[in-house]
């Protein structure tokens, strides 16, 4: 499909720069595809669209302060690393800027020697593999020196990093947040559970696959970057039970959609596994796992807007 089919005008002034005082007071657009109706609500109203027996699936990944600003040891030139994925031990796949100057053997200093990154492999489009050298526990060092990797369309710094996490964030490893979950509060989840709605956690650590721009004219030529996901035995059993009982499976966010669809389409049912996926969902995709989606608005020409377009067209 031509990438321009997913383009639209997005006024910058309509992009919220600050969160609402309360997470669930954000606006909600409820779309019923069976009768083409739209309702303008607040997010706390979402409970009225959920039924007893429904299953909500949420991505419990936690964002790490993955943006590092440092200087090259030899030249003192400034550079930036965005940690995307831990490979093994202290080796990480990173997006770099500027990329051309960071060759194999280059060393970058963050925080006066507290954290050193040495480039050990060059990949395409600004990707590099770095080995990190430090004392202590890596995530604790990262907490001291790293910054939260806010999307480029957010111009203002957050007053607290907790607002760039979901209330159910648990397992550290993401370079971006599963933002559809921002609007849920612990109190709202309690009400949801009291109504007889099941909540199941899965994990997908968000990296380049989710937010990498599409740079090709034909979407079939776009290659998704692999991201690691995990479905536990308990989660797989509960999901399969819900599927057998024909209960609705509702994914919170596109990363939950991709996790569920990647797993179910590969194995024919939900299977407990930890592995990578580069599933790319665009119009024409046959949804097997998910019955409804809770999602934010998305940027033009993004793989995320393609996923939502695929879901809408599949149900029409």
Per-region residue spans from a language model:
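Surface-exposed, charge/polar-rich loops and edge strands
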Residues: 1-316
């Amino acid at each position: 499909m031509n990438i321009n089919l997913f383009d639209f005008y997005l006024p910058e002034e309509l992009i919220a720069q600050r969160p609402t005082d309360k997470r669930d007071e954000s606006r909600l657009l409820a779309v019923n595809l069976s009768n083409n109706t739209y309702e303008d609500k607040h997010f706390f109203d979402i409970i009225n669209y959920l039924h007893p027996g429904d299953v909500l699936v949420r991505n419990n990944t936690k964002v790490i302060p993955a943006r590092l600003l440092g200087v090259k040891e030899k030249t003192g030139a400034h550079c930036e690393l965005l940690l995307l994925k831990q490979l093994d031990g202290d080796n990480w796949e990173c997006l770099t800027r500027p990329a051309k100057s960071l060759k194999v053997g280059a060393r970058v200093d963050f925080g006066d020697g507290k954290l050193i990154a040495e480039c050990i492999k060059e990949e395409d489009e600004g990707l590099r593999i770095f080995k990190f050298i430090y004392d202590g526990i890596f995530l604790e060092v990262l907490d001291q020196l790293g910054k939260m990797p806010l999307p480029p369309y957010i111009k203002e710094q957050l007053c607290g990093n907790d607002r760039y996490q979901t209330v159910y964030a648990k397992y550290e490893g993401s370079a971006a947040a599963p933002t559809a979950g921002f609007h849920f509060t612990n109190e709202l989840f309690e009400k949801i559970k009291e109504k007889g709605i099941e909540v199941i956690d899965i994990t997908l650590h968000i990296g380049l696959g989710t937010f990498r721009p599409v740079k090709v004219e034909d979407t079939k030529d776009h290659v998704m970057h692999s991201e690691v996901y995990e479905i536990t035995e308990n989660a797989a059993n509960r999901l399969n039970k819900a599927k057998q009982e024909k209960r609705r499976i509702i994914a919170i966010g596109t990363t939950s959609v991709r996790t569920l669809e990647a797993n179910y389409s590969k194995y024919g049912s939900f299977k407990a596994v930890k592995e990578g996926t580069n599933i790319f969902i665009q119009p024409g995709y046959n949804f097997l796992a998910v019955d409804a989606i809770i999602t934010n608005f998305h940027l033009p020409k993004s793989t995320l807007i393609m996923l939502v377009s695929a879901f809408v067209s599949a149900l029409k």
